[in-house]
Amino acid sequence: MSKNLINFSDLTKKDIFDFIELANNFKSEDSLNYRDENLFPDKKIVSMFCEPSTRTKLSFQIAAHNLGAKFIDFDLSNSSMNKGESLEDTLSAMEMMGVDLCILRHTESVIHDFVKNFSNMQFINAGEGSISHPTQTLIDLMTIHESKEKFENLNITIVGDLDHSRVVNSFIEAIQIVGYKSITFCGHPDLCKNFIESPIGNFEPELDTALQDADVVMTLRIQNERLSEKLTIGASDYVERYQINVDSLQVADPEMILLHPGPVNFGIELSKEASELENCKIRNQIFNGVGMRMAVLTKLFSQA
């Protein structure tokens, strides 16, 4: 295992299951919280988010607190990057100040290019452009594993804006490592151009067909901030054709589980009523975020 977590090429199948096991081990006895483990009181962690974040940043901060590490939230708006300092120079300054690990989110696909230049500071990719978000996928795999024992038996359907989702790219990388039975990609063709002829799954433009026989359904929001062209489908038509709701789920397997990496645009890709169904695991994903990120920090510090 690499000393950094940038994408799933850094991980083996054993690494992934070790993360899941360790994350579960951090749960309290009643499984309603996570234990405080003062494992890394001498470690300094900086979070540097060049894009907005709620769940990812907060769960990393709570994870670091639970592990006893020092957590510094880098204020990008008041930094010298606004004076023209490059990202790499800013990170170099952090390294020289003794930062042990940087949790980095960036709007562009740049993280994997320069981490090799840093020998004394580790990196976690907390979201890189539209190409990767490995810790979110580890959380998703942990959540699936709680309900479905064997990945190799799973029919998985992913619905929504696939072309602009970093989550789906990391998920595809990971699921090829742990195994799967089938993957169906579903959404409006404007948002799924890269998946219409995918070598690892089938594209199905009709939601009813895509949901049949699915063991896991992941729905994704439209990433309006990344769209470069106007969609040829209107909002009301999109909701009618692609929203996951109580009615659309009637064709799905009753044992199916429903995921969403967040943030959710309720009333668009997912109805509020569907999110309250027992087989919707969004709350589990949020809860598992803390434990999985505790596991990631622990494993990476053991590689330092």
Locate each region found by the language model.
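Positively charged, low-complexity intrinsically disordered leader regions
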Residues: 1-58, 62
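Anion-binding alpha/beta catalytic cores of soluble intermediary-metabolism enzymes, centered on
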Residues: 37, 91-94, 99-174, 260
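Active-site cofactor/substrate anionic-group-binding motifs, chiefly glycine-
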Residues: 44-97
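Glycine-rich phosphate/diphosphate-binding loop of Rossmann-like nucleotide-binding domains
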Residues: 50-61, 146-220
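Short, conserved loop/helix-junction motifs that constitute active-site signature segments
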Residues: 151, 177-179, 247-255, 277
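Rossmann-like adenosine-cofactor binding region
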Residues: 197-273
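Adenosine-phosphate binding glycine-rich loop
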Residues: 255-256, 261-304
